[in-house]
Amino acid sequence: MTAIAKIYAREILDSRGNPTLEAEVTLENAVCGRAAVPSGASTGTKEAVELRDGDKTRYLGKGVRAAVDNVNGVIAAALVGFDGADQTGLDHRLINLDGTENKGRLGANALLGVSLATAHAVAAARKQPLWMYLSTLGESKVSLPVPMMNIINGGAHADNNVDFQEFMVLPVGFASFSEALRAGTEIFHALKSVLKGQGLSTAVGDEGGFAPDLRSNVEALDAILEAIGRAGYIAGEDVLLGLDVASSEFRDNGKYNLVGENKRLTSEQFVDFLDDWVTQYPIISIEDGLAEDDWAGWKQLTERIGHKVQLVGDDLFVTNPKVFQEGITSGIANAILIKLNQIGTLTETLESIAMAHRAQYAAIVSHRSGETEDTSIADIAVATTATQIKTGSLCRSDRVAKYNQLLRIEQALGVGARYAGRDAFVSLKS
């Protein structure tokens, strides 16, 4: 019943107007699963390869026809007849079919599209929502994650003077996901009012957050704190703050170049800088606080504030189990950001999450800046008991689609729905 009868891919557009790949897998019982692949703006050097055509006369070189052809050709030929219910076996066949360390021959976008679409198809064949089916592949428990809401965009995600890429609010002091979402939404609208009152733009960046031309990173934090209060919530109690520093983007010749603060800092000085911020503001999470190749700096940052703040590796680990294991062994960071297209298959994604749980690292399931209406990451976050999810701000349908899916899942779970809330950070001590 779950043998694969047909695999087909097409080129579609993502939220930035760039081409991406969408795959469909049809089983022998005619049930079809579909998945679309996201794309990042700031990327780690060790990420799996996203295959682009490079033809400048078409989509500015960003077409994905080659990846589509790989799905419709060599991948389909290898997988038709394979049992889609054997997700691990299917993904290993995809990996072996590509045959490279970084999935550069067929493209991680080709592999991930097929991997995810197969899971959707099998879930549909079993008349289960995706989150319920995925929970049978690993974790038996499910929970609703804390949303890390990116409400001010900077860095590579916006055209402004803010160095840091994301300023987030984390509504932890609520009993349910739906109440947490409401709080985040009210803060988002309050922030719009704050920015308008300062004569600043309320245009939004790639992930739906505002991208005002603030003079410094500190101004972004101060504006968010004002918005939290104006919305009727208490910063540090109801709502905590998170940062995606994306520091690899502004490290140059061994120095961290903060244009907004007019500073060029060594690794040690930048650790001091972040430590000061944690003291001054209710910050609970810092992502990519140091550059991906600055492991000595990461070690120092972890030893300094890792007991009281979540230190997330994104570019640092690129969802790669081998790289992640090196970080665990070295005592680097205490959380990992999970981006499916960084590694390229569902099985490897689930393996990274399981590895995080075993090492007592937090796992945060994440979108990319170039998204689609696909909501798979919401189901994955719930099914794996990941304590947090990053899926952007409270506008743009490509972001809100994931929040709406989480609302549906919460309703489906009924009295069994459990919101992670403060428990997401129970291992951190002040």
From Swiss-Prot:
Designated name of the protein: Enolase
Record: residues binding Mg(2+): D244, E287, D314
Active-site residues (renumbered): E207 (proton donor), K339 (proton acceptor)
Family, similarity comment: Belongs to the enolase family.
Reactions listed under catalytic activity: (2R)-2-phosphoglycerate = phosphoenolpyruvate + H2O
Domain of life per record: Bacteria
Alphabetic keyword roster: Cytoplasm, Glycolysis, Lyase, Magnesium, Metal-binding, Secreted
Cofactor note: Binds a second Mg(2+) ion via substrate during catalysis.
Location of this chain's protein in the cell: Cytoplasm; Secreted; Cell surface
The protein's assembly and partners: Component of the RNA degradosome, a multiprotein complex involved in RNA processing and mRNA degradation.
Purpose: Catalyzes the reversible conversion of 2-phosphoglycerate (2-PG) into phosphoenolpyruvate (PEP). It is essential for the degradation of carbohydrates via glycolysis.
Pfam families attached to this UniProt entry: Enolase_C, Enolase_N
Keyword Metal-binding: yes
Annotated GO CC locations: cell surface; extracellular region; phosphopyruvate hydratase complex
Positions annotated to bind (2R)-2-phosphoglycerate: Q165, K339, R368, S369, K390
Pathway: Carbohydrate degradation; glycolysis; pyruvate from D-glyceraldehyde 3-phosphate: step 4/5
Keyword Disulfide bond: no
Coiled coil: none
EC id: 4.2.1.11
Cofactor(s) it depends on: Mg(2+)
Gene Ontology MF term list: magnesium ion binding; phosphopyruvate hydratase activity
Main location group: cytoplasm
